[in-house]
């Protein structure tokens, strides 16, 4: 069983896309936290040539050491 999960959110560039992905990442983190996950890291990255912004969320699964 995996102890760590990495979630990815992808949004295309448009007005307020950075705020939208931040809010979606925050909502996902809160939802997973209530399920027992613990946050390890959040990283935002921009793919200049593809026109997307990504959020990578690393969380520790519940009841793992």
Q: Model-found features: residue ranges?
A:
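Terminus-proximal functional modules
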Residues: 1-65
